[in-house]
Amino acid sequence: MVKESIPKEGENIKIQSYKHDGNIHRVWSETTILKGTDHVIIGGNDHTLVTESDGRTWITREPAIVYFHSEFWFNVICMFREDGIYYYCNLSSPFVCDEEALKYIDYDLDIKVYPNGKYHLLDEDEYEQHMNQMNYPHDIDVILRRNVDILQQWIEQKKGPFAPDFIKVWKERYKKIRNY
C-alpha cells in the first residue's frame, strides 16, 4: 500500500502522468509547491525537464502555474508567454500524491485556451482510439464528458485557475518562493 502524502509549500516534487493501462505517459522532473491540501495542489515550474514515455526529453519554455483538484477530472497548466497567458487543460483522473510524486491518469482530451479567451477541445480522435484500445469503462466516458462541460463553464465564467486574481496571486507567490 502506498502512503498518501500531501506536499508542503516550497517543496519540489515530480509530476507523473499515466495512461489508463497503467503505463507512464510523461514526467515533469520538478515543480515547486505553492499550496498543498487534501483537495487542491497548486505548483509552479519554469524550464523543467520533461521525459516522455519513449524516453525523449524536452524542457518547458516558460514559467507555468499548475492546478490540480481532487474532485475534478482535469488539471490546468497556466503558461506565461510574451503575448499573454495560455492555458492547457488535461482531462484526467483526480490527482493522488505519494512520497514519489503527484500522479494522475491522462485521458487524452485537452482544452487549449488562448489569451483572448477563445478555446478549443483537442485530441478527440486520440481519445476515441484509446477508449477502444484500452477499454475505458462507459462510466469513465460519462465522467470525462461531464468534466469537459464543467471545464468549459469555468473558462467562460473565469472561475478557478481562469480567474485573473488566481494568476496574479500564484505567479507572485512562485516568484517569492523561487526568489525571482
Swiss-Prot record:
Magnesium found in the keyword field: yes
Keywords, sorted A to Z: Hydrolase, Magnesium, Metal-binding
Gene3D superfamilies assigned: FomD-like
Positions that bind Mg(2+) 2: 108, 110, 123, 126
InterPro entries in alphabetical order: DUF402, FomD-like_sf, Ntdp-like, SA1684
The protein's Enzyme Commission number: 3.6.1.15, 3.6.1.6
UniProt KW Transcription keyword: no
Molecular function GO labels: magnesium ion binding; nucleoside diphosphate phosphatase activity; ribonucleoside triphosphate phosphatase activity
Positions with a binding annotation for Mg(2+) 1: 90, 106, 110
Catalytic activity of the protein: a ribonucleoside 5'-triphosphate + H2O = a ribonucleoside 5'-diphosphate + phosphate + H(+); a ribonucleoside 5'-diphosphate + H2O = a ribonucleoside 5'-phosphate + phosphate + H(+)
Cofactor: Mg(2+)
Domain of life: Bacteria
Active site: 26 (proton donor)
PANTHER family: PTHR39159, UPF0374 PROTEIN YGAC (PTHR39159:SF1)
Functional summary from the UniProt entry: Has nucleoside phosphatase activity towards nucleoside triphosphates and nucleoside diphosphates.
Family of the protein in this entry: Belongs to the Ntdp family.
Name of the featured protein: Nucleoside triphosphate/diphosphate phosphatase
Gene source species: Staphylococcus haemolyticus (strain JCSC1435)
